[in-house]
Amino acid sequence: TRRTAFLFDELSLWHSASQYALILPVGG
């Protein structure tokens, strides 16, 4: 259970990071 929660947290973090990576170049 804890491992799955950690994986989900990492996934959400990766998703937000990818969104920022897509938004930053366009905004800049």
From Swiss-Prot:
Activity regulation summary? Activated by divalent metal ions. Inhibited by certain thiol reagents.
A GO molecular function term, named singly, is: arylalkyl acylamidase activity
Transmembrane stretches, start-end: none
What reaction does this enzyme carry out catalytically?
Answer: an N-acetylarylalkylamine + H2O = an aralkylamine + acetate
UniProt KW keywords: Hydrolase
Tell me its EC number(s), please. Answer: 3.5.1.76
Q: What does this protein do?
A: Shows a strict specificity for N-acetyl arylalkylamines but not acetanilide derivatives.
What is annotated about its quaternary structure and interactions? Homotetramer.
Please state what the protein is called.
Arylalkyl acylamidase
Species lineage: Bacteria, Pseudomonadati, Pseudomonadota, Gammaproteobacteria, Pseudomonadales
